[in-house]
């Protein structure tokens, strides 16, 4: 009994494979923390859309680049990254039109789709009422943000996202759901939220097995939204 308790205590004290304070444990990689970190992939540097494609047909992205930002050209379609990603840290800055037009979901609407499937809502949510799971910072249709720290129309705002993709078993069944943590303008708004499946409008589709890496997508929802300083770090 004493031996059993001792072994239990040891397993609780050192739950990982390395002994506490082991000098043999692999060191974390050293990165420059400047904007962006030195190990980040810059998806948009304010100059061109070489890292992006049209989602519809994989042709060159058709949004407008000017003055260090890219602006949605309504009607040209959603834009997808040229490469795929799974677990990531994402930084992206966005701004709604300076002159607010429309109400609810019609005002400054776009979306950031992790793996092209899991949407983090982009919306002008400054003094603009809509359903809570559709406002800025919501995991669309699933979870409202914890708080609303949005700025007024035309002001630059920033998302910092930690996303962990879902894991699937060999038979296609779900092993672990996707998880998302989000800061908006430095304020925590999604705290390791477990997604119940792909995001969708007025429906809740189940998880379906998909590749471990898929493109990031930025949505054309008919509003001239702006984005800048987009970088991403692979976490796997």
Task: Give each language-model segment a name.
Residues 2-10:
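Sec-dependent N-terminal signal peptides
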Residues 12-236:
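Carbohydrate-interacting regions of secretory-pathway proteins
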């Amino acid at each position: 009994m004493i031996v059993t308790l001792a072994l239990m205590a040891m397993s609780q004290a050192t739950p990982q494979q390395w002994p506490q304070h082991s000098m043999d444990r692999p060191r974390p990689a050293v990165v420059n923390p400047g904007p962006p970190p030195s190990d980040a992939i810059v998806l948009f540097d304010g100059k061109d859309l070489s890292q992006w494609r049209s989602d519809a047909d994989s042709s060159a992205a058709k949004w407008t680049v000017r003055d260090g930002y890219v602006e949605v050209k309504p009607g040209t379609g959603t834009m997808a990254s040229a490469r795929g990603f799974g677990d990531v840290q994402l930084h992206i800055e966005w701004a709604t039109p300076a002159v607010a037009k429309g109400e609810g979901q019609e005002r400054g609407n776009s979306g950031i789709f992790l793996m092209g499937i899991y949407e983090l809502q982009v919306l002008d949510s400054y003094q603009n009422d809509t359903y809570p799971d559709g406002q800025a910072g919501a995991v669309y249709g699933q979870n409202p943000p914890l708080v609303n720290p949005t700025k007024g129309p035309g002001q630059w705002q920033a998302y910092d996202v930690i996303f962990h993709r879902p894991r699937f078993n060999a038979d296609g069944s779900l092993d672990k759901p996707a998880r998302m943590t989000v800061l908006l303008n430095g304020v925590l708004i999604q705290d390791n939220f477990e997604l119940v499946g792909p995001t969708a409008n007025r429906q809740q589709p189940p998880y379906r097995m998909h590749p471990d890496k898929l493109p990031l997508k930025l949505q054309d929802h008919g509003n001239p939204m702006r984005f800048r300083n987009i970088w991403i770090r692979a976490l796997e």
